[in-house]
Amino acid sequence: MGDYIVVLEAPIIVKDVESVEEAIEAAVNKVMTALEKEKLDFVRVELGYSKCPVCGAHFESAFVVGNIGLVGIYLTLKVFNAQSLEHAERIAKAVVGKALKKVPLKLFEIRELHDGREENNGIEAGENETNA
């Protein structure tokens, strides 16, 4: 059994926005509201970044076309007592998926925690787990 930090990537679509900044704000608010409804205040929400295939520079994953915005969001949470990396991923997707229904979640990064200095605010294996 191990403890993991799992980072999921989610594409969020927002409507009636005119700028990238407005799209980012609307997407973050949409995600935060959904997470708060499910009492998932331990999930950290961050703006995603994409890498330019030509120069390698990173830029914000937010695009606006025709007043529709697509924003990449990273969702980070700790998963405790998971049996494996894959188990931790399934738990994270199940927990976040309850709040973000119909939003595809992709694993961005997963790290095993080795030191006990991390704070205990996350989800424990078996707690709130559904079929993912």
Curated annotation (Swiss-Prot):
Family that this chain belongs to: Belongs to the UPF0212 family.
PANTHER family: UPF0212 PROTEIN MJ0068 (PTHR42199), UPF0212 PROTEIN TK1194 (PTHR42199:SF1)
Transmembrane portions of the chain: none
Superkingdom of the source species: Archaea
Annotated organism of origin: Pyrococcus abyssi (strain GE5 / Orsay)
Short name of any one Pfam family annotated for the protein: DUF555
Cited InterPro entries: UPF0212 (IPR007564)
Annotated protein name in UniProt: UPF0212 protein PYRAB08340
